[in-house]
Amino acid sequence: VSHHHSWSDRLRAAVAARGRLCVGIDPHPALLEAWDLPRSADGLEVFAELCVEAFVGEVAVVKPQVAFFESYGSAGYAVLERTVGVLRDAGTLVIADAKRGDIGTTMDAYAQAWLEPGSPLSSDAVTVSPYLGFDSLGAALDRAVAHDRGVFVLARTSNPEGSALQHASMSTGGSVAQSIVDAAAARNLVDADTVGLVVGATRDHGLDLSGYRGPVLAPGLGAQGATVNDLAEIFRDCRELLLPNSSRSVLAAGPSVTALRAAATQLRDEIEAGLA
């Protein structure tokens, strides 16, 4: 993996070559069971290896859900470290879905864990939560810029209970979610595409994305509402770097590597056709 290219360049090149689908690696206990794997770090390792074999070279971006590894403690983290390393060595971009959020030196330590070259968990990008204020993410954004990595900030999530908070009005006008979009847009004028947004693939996200230039990670495809055919309309302002994320609908095809790969490539092609 060349680290001399910016995150933006790497993302654009990967998407041009292998489409915009982002596949989740979510070793949910029920999935381990469905794949006939033990609910242990050993089962986790096999699950991750099957996913890697299925997705490398076929999809541009893979998003491991950190919680499902963390639940097995250090053994689970060891599996995650190996998985992230193998994916990145193979040229697949990795978004660590860790949703970290904190302030000052603590935020910086999280950023060091997920974005610093040489860190065991070093990924191409990490998801972060702006609940402590967008500016609390400063250390992570600075580290991302320094190392040509990306940060995806939660703006409007696809879970129904997010609405009350995310649609709440700011004293300055506009919704909380829109304020995150606007802050990300402003930051990207300085550091192109460093700040991505997480915006759920729902028809009613209610955001004005017309002023935002950068990647959008859009979870909730299929399982939580929006279909592939909805994407072009819902995200018309930011289709170029839209990364629709699907985990369940693809992983349901496992444990066969052939079936997993077929599910991913079919969805990838449907997404590309829908966004054309």
Label each residue range with its predicted role.
Residues 15-16, 52-58, 82-89, 141-147, ...:
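Acidic (Asp/Glu)-rich catalytic clusters
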Residues 17, 59, 117-124, 145-151, ...:
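Glycine-enriched alpha-helix->loop->beta-strand junction motifs that scaffold or abut catalytic
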Residues 27-31, 66-70, 100-102, 130-132, ...:
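Active-site-proximal loop/turn and secondary-structure-junction residues that shape catalytic pockets
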Residues 197, 201-245, 249-250:
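A C-terminal functional module that forms or caps the active site or interfaces directly
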